Curated annotation (Swiss-Prot):
Chain residues carrying a lipid of type N-palmitoyl cysteine: 22
Primary localization class, coarse: membrane
Protein name stated in the entry: Lipid A acyltransferase PagP
Family: Belongs to the lipid A palmitoyltransferase family.
Complexes and interactors: Homodimer.
GO molecular function: O-palmitoyltransferase activity
Keywords: Acyltransferase, Cell outer membrane, Lipoprotein, Membrane, Palmitate, Signal, Transferase
Highest taxon above the source species: Bacteria
Gene: pagP
Length: 182
C-alpha cells in the first residue's frame, strides 16, 4: 500500500509546479516555464493507454523472456498543444504494469517534430523527459530519464513507441502506448 501512496504523492508534487507563474524563475529557465504553463493552461486534454512492451530477444535468455510481463496495461492523462511551428508538446502522467507486473508511475514532458501526410495523418519524432519510479531500481525512489519518441497519428489518435536501451540482461525494451485527444 505504501508504494501507491508514494506514486500518488509523486504525481501531486508535479501538478502545482506547472501551474505557478514564471516571473520568479531565472531568465535561462523562464522560456521553459512559460511553455509548460502554456501547455497546462491552453492545452487540450489527452487520454493515454499503455499496452505492450517487447523485450529484445537477443539480450535475454528464453527463460528470462518467459518471466517478463509484456502486456504493460495501464493509462493516464495529459495536456498537449501543437505549437506555432506545428510541433507537438505535451505533459503527461501515467501508471502501468512494468516487466515484473509491478506498477510503474511516470510523469513528464514530450516534444515531437511533426510531419503531415495529408490533412489528418501525421508522423512524429522527438523525445520525452520524465520522472519515474520502479521497484527494481533504487527501491522506488523517483529518478529522471530521457528517451527517444516516435509516433504515427490519425485525427485524434496517436500511437507512440520508445526504446529503453540497456545491456545484456537489462533494458532493451520497446514500449508502445497510445494517446486520444479529447
Amino acid at each position: 500500500m505504501t508504494q501507491y501512496f508514494r506514486a500518488l504523492a509523486f504525481f501531486l508534487l508535479l501538478v502545482p509546479a506547472t501551474a505557478m507563474a514564471c516571473d520568479g524563475w531565472p531568465s535561462w529557465a523562464r522560456g521553459a516555464c512559460q511553455r509548460v504553463d502554456q501547455i497546462w493552461n491552453e492545452g487540450g486534454n489527452d487520454l493515454y493507454l499503455t499496452g505492450y512492451s517487447w523485450h529484445n530477444r537477443a539480450m535475454y535468455s528464453s527463460d528470462k523472456i518467459r518471466s517478463f510481463n509484456e502486456l504493460a496495461w495501464g493509462g493516464g492523462l495529459g495536456k498537449s498543444i501543437y505549437d506555432e511551428d506545428g510541433d507537438w508538446q505535451g505533459l503527461y502522467a501515467m501508471a502501468f504494469l512494468d516487466s515484473h507486473s509491478d506498477i510503474e508511475p511516470i510523469a513528464g514532458y514530450g516534444f515531437q517534430k511533426i510531419g503531415r501526410i495529408g490533412a489528418d495523418t501525421r508522423l512524429g519524432i522527438g523525445y520525452t523527459v520524465f520522472l519515474t519510479s520502479r521497484s527494481d531500481i533504487m527501491s522506488r525512489v523517483p529518478f529522471p530519464g530521457i528517451l527517444p519518441l516516435v509516433s504515427a497519428g490519425y485525427r485524434d489518435a496517436t500511437l507512440y513507441a520508445t526504446y529503453i536501451p540497456g545491456g545484456k540482461g537489462n533494458g532493451n525494451v520497446l514500449f508502445m502506448f497510445g494517446r486520444w485527444e479529447f
